[in-house]
């Protein structure tokens, strides 16, 4: 093994000349001159958005916004077991959007975008963070840390904070025996199921269904707190251990945490790809996420065997499968589906 440069002089022969010693000394790189590690937030495939207000004026050697973004990115990379360089090679970016900050805590959205090609999907989380000494502690939506940090903070309005923290806590709420979730259009109306169960994040679980036709309007499948993740992608966190995603929306209503009821207008079917992925033909990409399901762990939930809008879904090949309702019949991709509610 070759000793480090700073220790090489002690291994030179005793009769070394002064000139040689000076040469050896000159080749050693002083610690202070070494290139510092680049912050994650400075990477070419990272974008940091949102507010500065409410963050500390200074935070050690790095700006508070950069330091917070670094901690959020580190959690995202850890949860997805990946690296920024790997995401960059996949043409994926990371966005950190800081929405609110107060009293040493912060709340926002973290997104990993997808290339705009078929079969690639983005993924996103709400996050909560708090100052812990000289470090930001971060919790991503669906983790115990998220719920604990949010519940103990003064972020958001009191009712919103308490409801979202409890609803997204994997330990505090048991999922209901049925999903208690409808379909992404008005109860008592119909749309065409253009795509059967398929993935939202590059493969299984098959958590998503595509709808089009009808009056074209996307509406909340159950009440809850609605968050615009980007301009065309909404997530509604419900009170029963589930949340629902609505993607590709146009004529979009921006919702920064509004308490919405079942059937609340979210936008219209479209081809928006605000976080990447692809869309062929205007539609609503509708997906189910779970917090208390041990198989979901705050992630997308397989629809196979679950009932939404009065229909029980059965998966097959991606975008295939079907849905059935006893006494009514079976709907395959391309068929009309009536929303019976829940």
Spans of model-derived segments:
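Secretory targeting and sorting signals
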Residues: 1-34
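Short, non-transmembrane alpha-helical segments in secretory-pathway proteins
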Residues: 52-95
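Exposed beta-strand-loop-beta-strand "reactive/processing" segments of non-cytosolic proteins
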Residues: 93-131
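Surface-exposed, glycine-biased beta-strand/turn segments
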Residues: 149-233, 317-342
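Conserved, short, structured surface segments that act as functional micro-motifs
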Residues: 203-210, 258-342
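Short, well-structured beta-strand-loop connectors
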Residues: 217-228, 254-270
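Zn2+-dependent peptidoglycan hydrolase active-site motif and core
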Residues: 220-253, 274-283
């Amino acid at each position: 093994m070759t000793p480090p440069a700073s220790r090489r002089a002690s291994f030179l022969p005793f009769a070394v000349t002064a000139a040689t010693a000076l040469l050896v000394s000159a080749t050693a790189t002083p610690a202070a001159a070494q290139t510092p590690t680049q912050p994650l937030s400075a990477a070419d495939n990272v974008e940091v958005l949102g507010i500065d207000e409410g963050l500390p004026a200074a935070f050690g050697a790095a700006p508070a916004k950069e330091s917070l973004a670094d901690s959020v990115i580190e959690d995202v990379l850890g949860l997805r077991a990946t690296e920024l360089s790997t995401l960059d090679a996949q043409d994926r970016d990371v966005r950190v959007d800081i929405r609110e900050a107060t009293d040493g805590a912060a709340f926002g959205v973290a997104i990993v975008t997808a290339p705009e090609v078929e079969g690639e999907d983005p993924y996103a989380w709400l996050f909560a963070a708090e100052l812990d000494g000289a470090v930001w502690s971060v919790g991503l939506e669906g983790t115990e840390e998220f719920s604990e940090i949010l519940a103990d903070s003064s972020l958001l309005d009191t009712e919103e904070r308490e409801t979202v923290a409890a609803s997204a806590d994997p330990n505090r709420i048991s999922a209901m025996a049925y999903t208690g979730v409808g379909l992404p259009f008005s109860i008592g109306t119909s749309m065409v199921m253009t795509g059967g169960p398929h993935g939202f994040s590059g493969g299984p679980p098959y958590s998503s269904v595509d709808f089009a036709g009808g009056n074209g309007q996307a509406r909340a499948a159950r009440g809850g707190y609605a968050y615009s993740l980007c301009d065309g992608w909404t997530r509604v966190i419900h009170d029963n251990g589930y949340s629902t995603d609505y993607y590709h929306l146009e004529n979009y209503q921006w919702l920064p945490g509004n308490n919405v009821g079942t059937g609340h207008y979210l936008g219209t079917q479209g081809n928006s790809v605000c976080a990447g992925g692809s869309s062929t033909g205007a539609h609503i990409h509708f997906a189910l996420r779970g917090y208390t399901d041990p198989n979901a762990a705050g992630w997308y939930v397989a629809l196979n065997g679950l009932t939404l809008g009065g229909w029980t879904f059965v998966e097959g090949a991606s975008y295939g499968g079907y849905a059935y309702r006893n006494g009514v019949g079976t709907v395959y991709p391309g068929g009309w589906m009536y929303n019976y509610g829940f």
